[in-house]
Amino acid sequence: MGCMKSKQTFPFPTTLESEKRHVSEENFMPEEKFLPRIPSLVNVKEEVKEPPGPQIVVFEFAQHLSQEILSDALQQWAGNNLKYYDIPYIESEGP
């Protein structure tokens, strides 16, 4: 009888199908896509814009919050390190 999974069709395209698809796609693709693009010689000036007020407040809050989280994490790690520093690390050889 066999397994039902083995009788189902493979959901992904085979290599032959993908090769046929690429051949047909090349006919419809313009030649411009294959040519390297040359940057234009127009002078582009980048302007540095100051972020508006609310964005500065949000940035400062996020910076403060990330520093607080990092500080708490380091304190927690230090506490656990002191608590368990005298227990030797034992490597296991099996699961």
Swiss-Prot record:
Which Pfam families does its entry note?
A: SmAKAP (PF15127)
**What keywords tag this UniProt record?**
Cell membrane, Lipoprotein, Membrane, Myristate, Palmitate, Phosphoprotein
> At the top level of its lineage, which domain of life is listed?
Eukaryota
**Cellular localization per UniProt:** Cell membrane
Annotated segments matching region PKA-RI-binding: 56-74
Under the GO molecular function aspect, what terms does this record hold?
Answer: protein kinase A regulatory subunit binding
Q: How is it modified after translation?
A: May be palmitoylated at Cys-3.
Chain positions found as Phosphoserine: S40, S92
Lipid-binding residues (covalent, N-myristoyl glycine): G2
* GO CC list: plasma membrane
Q: Where is the lipid attached (S-palmitoyl cysteine)?
A: C3
- Please explain the role this protein plays, according to its UniProt record: Binds to type I regulatory subunits of protein kinase A (PKA-RI) and may anchor/target them to the plasma membrane.
- Note the subunit structure: Interacts with PKA type I regulatory subunits PRKAR1A and PRKAR1B. Also binds to type II regulatory subunits, but at a tenfold lower affinity.
Q: What does the similarity note say?
A: Belongs to the small membrane AKAP family.
What's this protein's name? Answer: Small membrane A-kinase anchor protein
